[in-house]
Structure formats: structure tokens, C-alpha cells
Design a protein with these regions (language model features):
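Zinc-dependent deaminase catalytic domain
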Residues: 3-198
């Protein structure tokens, strides 16, 4: 008999290698929304370019302490991540990292998330996923008592999802009491990084 070993992609890090070291973050002044968006854009540059996705970066911040809780980028987490194998969005990566830091499932993140958490994302959170996985808007709404504000760099281009579906996502956040604010002045740079591979 031949024992088959599980496939391991040498170009994708393991969950242990991602979670092992505590990431050091730059010091960004409280209320410097462009500074946080620049850091989210830096994360987006790590995302592998492909014609079937956008390169998105996100930063999750405890606004009361002005402390970065986690960062994430599209497809950052490996294929063997049980939370969402190989299809992790930037915002979701932020949530998974905080949950795992506390040995929790993402669904229990509300047990440890600070009451005044802010999310910075280079592209608006998805309201529909072609993969059928849970959209980022739904993930944020599950945490709406903790995530009070979402800062966005750009609207999602209509490459995959119709703009009307995306507008509904923004409206769902606002209707649930989550403030949605677009950071102006970085759109061209964010779009260039987001569209890498297209």
C-alpha cells in the first residue's frame, strides 16, 4: 500500500507560520484615516495578482486604544484554513487572526473584539461571493455592536458583481448602524493595486 500525503503548496504559508510571530505594526496617529488606509494598501500589495480576484488589504483597529488588532489581504490564509479554504478575503483574514489569537472560532469573535473597533479596507466589503462563501458584509453585520465604522478606499469595480448588489451591501451596513466612510484622494493608487493581474 502507498500512503498518500496531503497536498501542500510550497508557495502558500501554513496557518502555523502565519500565526506564529506577532506582527509588528507602524505607529499611526489616532484619527489618521489616510495613514491607516495607506497601511491597508500596503497589505493589498501582498495579495497574489490574478484575473479572477481583486488585491485587497484591510486593517482592524481598536479605536479607543489606537491599536492595530490585525491586518489581512486577499488569499492571505492558506488552502488548509478550515474557516474558508483558499478563498479568504482581506476583512475575513483580519477577523480570523484576532479569533485565533484568542483560540476562538471566527463566529465567537464578539467575545474578544473591543467595543469601538474600526475596519479599514481598500475596497468596499463584498455583499455577494461567487464562491457561495459568507460575504464580508454579513461578517461585519454579525459584529455590528463592535465594528462601528468601516473606512473604504474604493467601490468594487463591476468586474464580477453588479454595482446594484454592492450598493445594497453599503446600505445594509448603514441601516444596521455601521458608519461607512470613503477615504478620498487615494482612489487611483488603490485601483492600480486592486486590479493587478487583470
Amino acid at each position: 500500500t502507498t500512503l498518500l500525503k496531503p497536498f501542500s503548496n510550497p508557495f502558500r504559508p501554513t496557518l502555523a507560520s502565519i500565526m506564529a510571530p506577532e506582527q509588528s505594526h507602524p505607529t499611526i496617529a489616532a484619527g489618521d484615516h489616510k495613514g491607516y488606509m495607506e497601511y491597508a494598501l500596503e497589505q493589498a500589495r501582498h495579495s497574489p495578482p490574478a484575473p479572477t480576484k481583486f488585491c485587497v488589504g484591510a486593517v482592524l483597529v481598536d479605536a479607543d486604544k489606537n491599536e492595530i488588532l490585525s491586518t489581512g489581504w486577499s488569499l492571505e490564509l492558506p488552502d488548509n484554513n478550515p474557516a474558508d479554504p483558499g478563498k479568504t478575503h482581506a476583512e475575513q483574514c483580519c477577523f480570523i487572526k484576532v479569533a485565533q489569537k484568542h483560540n476562538l472560532q471566527e463566529e465567537r469573535l464578539c467575545e474578544v473584539l473591543p467595543k469601538n473597533t474600526v475596519l479599514y479596507t481598500t475596497m468596499e466589503p463584498c455583499n455577494k461571493r461567487l464562491s457561495g462563501n459568507k460575504p464580508c458584509v454579513d461578517r461585519i453585520l454579525r459584529l455590528k455592536d463592535y465594528i462601528k465604522t468601516v473606512y473604504i478606499g474604493i467601490k468594487e469595480p463591476e468586474n464580477f458583481i453588479d454595482q446594484s448588489v454592492l450598493v445594497i451591501g453599503r446600505k445594509r451596513l448603514v441601516d444596521a448602524g455601521v458608519e461607512v466612510t470613503f477615504i478620498e484622494g487615494m482612489e487611483d493608487r488603490i485601483l492600480e493595486v486592486s486590479m493587478a493581474g487583470h
